[in-house]
Amino acid sequence: MHNRYIFATSALLVLAGTLRWSHALAEASAENVAELEEIVITAQKRTEKLQDVPVSAMVVSAQALANANVADLSDLNNLVPSVQLNGTINGRVPTGIRGISSVSNEQTVGISSGVAINIDGVPVPSDSFAANNVAGIQNIEVLLGPQSTLGGRTAASGLINLTTRGPSDTLQGFATTTLTRDDEHRFEIFLSGPLSDRVEGSLSAYKSTTRYPITNLATGDKTTQDVAGGRGKLLFKVTDDLDVTLMAHSELTQGHGFNFVYSYITPGHDLLFTAPPAFEPPFLTPAILLPGITPSSNNLDYASPVTSAGASHRDADFSLTIEDRLGGGYTLASTTAFQQEKQAQTQDLFAVDNFFWNSLTGNNVHIPGHPLAPFFNTQSQVSTVKQLSEELKLVSPTDLPFSWLAGAFYSDTNVDETYIRSLPPAGLDVHVVPDTKTYDLYARSTWKFAPATSLVTGLRFNHDAISYTYDERTNVVRFGVPGLPDIIEGPFFSSGSSSGNTVVGDVGLKQQFADNVMGYVTYSRGYSPAAYNTSAVLYSNAALDPVGKESIDSVEIGTKGTYFNRTLTFNADIFDTRYTDYQIQSYANAPGVITPPLDLSSVGKAETRGAELSTEWLATSTTRLNLSAAYIDAKFVDYMGAPCYGLQTAAQGCVTPANGSPSQDVSGDTMPNSPKFKATLGVEQRIPLGSHPYELVFGGTYSYRTSAQMLPDQNPFAIQSGFGLLNLSAALQSSDGKYSARFFVNNVTNRHYFTDVEDFWSGPWNGNALIGQPARDSVRYAGLKLTASF
């Protein structure tokens, strides 16, 4: 292990030195007429050049987002190899970096996935859907690996910062529209400019309809998502040194239909077939419940009589930023932000083409005084997510021998959720309100103690206070048929609170080998805070015990360089990150359990290690290539007591203690949804049309990933084979880039794949039942994008 990393470190340093000399020779022998653009990032609390920051990071520009036809945040999967986003139209977007993610389902509230997501530096609540849409985004910055020192409590495995377009001192803007053959359409407009001598403004508006390749065979409808919103900013230049920026954002996202389809059901198994033989009619068989559907990894269909399935998310966000340039290059800045999202969601509980419970009981279910019967296959969730945050920071100039920044951060995140499952055999009516407060102090410094050597250190003190109230108004098992007695639990009420302090930090050494070539080594200490499993089912009024916090130790060694007269960038790193008391969510599947509980547990240890690289080459003034790749080995080091998958036998490792649930030991097994290798290759070729003020632009990207186990229980039917996605485009645009018409084809080879797989319906099928979520681009589609700017 250690020898492997010594060798890798030496290889990186030798490579950096070799490229340094190549860089010098190229400068001495050639003069290029084109250079790569300088990329800056703001995710570390100040504006910095990407190539100067001693951390593994990638930036996806607005142009790259447009060229890749990125529709939502989950499309980062195909652009940043170390990122894995499940994507969903019905709730939160579980996010992982380097194979690490804690959240598996949007039902759980108040818990972070381990990846901090910010918009213009303001943290987005983990339960919010607000960051899923990328309309109005200038670029996306991705910091890989633990970022707890500056990212805070939610950045255990990384940080994603979306920067939005803002005001300008000249009038500018653009309008763009996208149409596809499968009836997707998008429209976006942006305007920016001066309103007076000391006031500048910007306004963006967008609207889209996306039809996913998922069909409800019972109705013929496609799963669809509609988005409409806008963002406005006002910049007041109060004095030459004092700026005040106001931001308001509103968005409505509405999803229609279901986003999962069956990928596997154990042959010969029927829904609820554990009921007495007299209640096993043929309409509980897959042939009747799933007409015309063959569960498989290529399935794109479901069948449901539920027409109300879908979700809506209404966002209203506001921020006030005050920036005071104090003189001498020092800046004092304050950002106050309020975010609110109202969510409503209705799901088809088992996604079958029959109101099976009503048919089973002859529509005669009657529960006196109870509003949950008869059952029409739905469960619903209504939530309001609110967050108030304040950040105050003081930043020194960067050109000092000792530069630094220091700040204080406060946030209060509250989620108010009502969850109703009206299935009489497992009815549930819950109102849960978790609240999370954090009080933080942080500092980061860079000491250039030698002409080419700097020491980078950081420290953060966090005080986390978590609390909840849990009102379980109904928890029943009611069959409504003769001979089957009702089982009634509750009502129950529980509440609790917990708080704790944590100190995290990092220390690193940065070595400048040449003006444009540097190497670094960094040790980081991070954490994920304690949390309550508010998706648990109560069986008493006792307070829940919080799941303990997670601690993280990470080492990263890397190099960054710009070569050949700024026509080539090459960045590479290796990393090793250890997680102790790792937090993970999983469903406790067991035969006959209709609705398995979602468990949040703190397992022993987990680890991710590997290597990453990203490079871009401006081969000529009209030819550009880029390559990014990641090899990631993410696994459970110590995870005993993991849930078993459906029908897992003792010979396959599933054991059932005398007084416990079936469990297994998955120590040494892979993390869920973490391919060992991912890579993306992109190319762009511009062809000027002689004396005409236009040019042709041809582009393509190929993204490849190896096979991946999609579930922590290591279900053998949840392995997705490796695949590649090829996207091609051709455009006619003006030479100044102001006007363009681009034709594109995504997923040229028509390779179907899932972004998520779950097996929590194994219990009701009393076997092994899996559902998968097809990606938007899991079938080939073509489109046209028109853009005009000024």
Model-derived regions, located:
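N-terminal Sec signal peptide and the immediately downstream disordered periplasmic leader
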Residues: 1-68, 75-79, 192, 240, ...
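Acidic, small-polar-rich N-terminal luminal/periplasmic segments of exported/outer-membrane proteins
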Residues: 34-170, 557
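Outer-membrane beta-barrel translocator/receptor signature
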Residues: 112-114, 126, 135-144, 148-216, ...
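Periplasmic-side early beta-strands and strand-to-turn transitions of outer-membrane beta-barrels
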Residues: 161, 168-170, 178, 190-291, ...
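Structural signature of Gram-negative outer-membrane beta-barrels, strongest in the C-terminal barrel
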Residues: 235-239, 394-397, 403, 409-411, ...
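Membrane-embedded beta-barrel scaffold of Gram-negative outer-membrane proteins
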Residues: 319-349, 512-530, 546-618, 624, ...
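Gram-negative outer-membrane beta-barrel transporters
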Residues: 455, 576-578, 601-710, 787-789
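C-terminal beta-signal and adjacent terminal beta-strands/loops
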Residues: 578, 692, 703-711, 732-790
